[in-house]
Amino acid sequence: METLSYNIVIRAPKQKIWDILWAPETYTKWTQYFSEEPTIIKSDWKVGGRTLFVDHNNNGMVATISNLDEPNEVTFNHLGIVENGEDDIESEKIKQWSGAPERYSLILLDDGSVKLHVEIQIDPEYREVMDRGFTNGLQTIKKLAEEKEFPV
């Protein structure tokens, strides 16, 4: 497993950035760079609860939230994959990376801007996908957050 981190400074309030990260109408905009299929997030937003990152065919990832401090930080721990709506959290391949964290932190800087810091643990074979996804995705979050007309 490899730990990757990504950062971007955004001139917007933390809550606005948080909402852009996780609101259904904006989540698909910044995550479009990770795969060809649009991905949605379905979560009960509870520590120990269930979170799905899936496409329209119900294929994707299943995770749980291990830390939630809105609008400052959330940590997802990936548990397995979802294929055709069925969870796989038991296979040997899954057990190699099950529990891998994905953390989003919003840090207020001295000048009033906010640093969005993402840290994710992945299998090295997915590094290129993550680099492309987060590099482009964080730019999209910044653009949306710094637009005046986006509701807070």
Where are these regions (language model features)?
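Short beta-edge strand/loop motif at the mouth of beta-sheet-based domains
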Residues: 5, 25-62, 73, 152
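Short, charged/polar surface micro-motifs in flexible loops or helix N-caps
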Residues: 57-59, 67-74, 80-84
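Short, mixed charged/polar active-site loops
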Residues: 3, 60, 99-101
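Amphipathic alpha-helical segments
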Residues: 11-31
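Short amphipathic
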Residues: 3-10
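Beta-strand/loop substructures that line and gate deep hydrophobic ligand-binding cavities in soluble
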Residues: 77-78, 83-135, 152
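Short amphipathic alpha-helical signal-transduction/dimerization elements
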Residues: 138-149
